């Protein structure tokens, strides 16, 4: 089949299928293609086009949000085939076993599924993401050093945890051929879902209503519907749809739109290692298949539970690029490249803005000192040979690479001093939420008011984690952390924000009173509407969301085969 672009349609129409999947991001594409592979007749509905279209992207805008805590939605998400995978970096990290534990110190942290259930889908998720094998431990790296620095063995603190990196895989380009050549799958673009209709108290959705910017209206009839529009857009669609008992679809328990989570991330300390600088594993490594991986600092589950620590990870990072006091020609060259008119070619907006000093919530960097151009040029002139070699090497591996691209770069520090970047759990909080606004978009859909909140517990968890990391470094005799701020709590709080990882607002639960969807991602009380999104996650963990989104989409597709092929 070919792509059916409905964006210019002005007439009404009806489409019938066994399964309608709403949203062609990673969750929607995986669910649709897997279901089609099971012989199910699938329609995949995408609000955007195959390429980027600004007028459609504007439909993602929120009505109200705190710009000091939340990134603007048009920057945080992408409304097109491929979804936000068209602008992501490619980091692939699964949740940890501790994330699925019902932890007494984490409010409402009970999942209706287990880690082992989800781990069974990790190999297939890796295949879809093209990030190699489902091996997330450095012990499997060939001929690799046993630890980040000599003498830093795993204990309560571990450094053998790995993150994997995809191509990065743009689902819109990687899987477009399959989407357009599978006989029992139709991809419809330029048409935006407006509401799901559940007649009376039947307990099942009858149809989906959708509109085009040109004024056309389309009604989709199916046996089952999968909402895969991204975290907040999936929540918005449920809120805009009437439930079988009145109110909002999935809103009977009062949890819909609540528990909105992101992650806590930033830099408040430097590593100062006392081991030989040339033996520090500061950069990416390659696994047996040539896939880029990177080591992370973490804690064992037992240590986290004993010390009531939120889940968190950390890793060696680069100094902030805009501040030329780093005196590194390579860093200055990258900064100037990102600031140039070609900057948008080299990096997505969120990453580029953050790395060039813009204070963008939900990113680890931003708001640093910005040095004059002449100081960056001085760094480059002072190190012409090493800078030139870097440009040639990284340019080949990143810009010119046709398949697997280098995810990024890290520069060696001869003094063995490196920033420590952290990425930690945002604790569940029912007061952190989104609501429908009175303001509507061009299609008449209510927009969202976003109220993302953090608490002192989020800040305290980050600070305590650093204290424990510092203790471990000192006890191992390999170095220490040097803090960059006198008031660590204020420094952590200043960087708190989100918008890129949208977690929790349609949370899953075993009992209808405790959430929005069940263990199979079906909306409680409406057995044929499912949600495939990070919004169903009960906790945020230390991992970014994409890997687990794909794992849950695979699990959902297997469940749908049983439902629609029984």
How would you describe each model-predicted region?
Residues 64, 253-256, 265, 269-446, ...:
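FAD cofactor-binding and catalytic pocket of flavoenzymes
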Residues 25-26, 232, 536:
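Residue-level detector of alpha-helix initiation sites
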Residues 188-201, 396-435, 443-539, 546:
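A glycine-rich dinucleotide-binding beta-alpha-beta segment and adjacent secondary-structure elements
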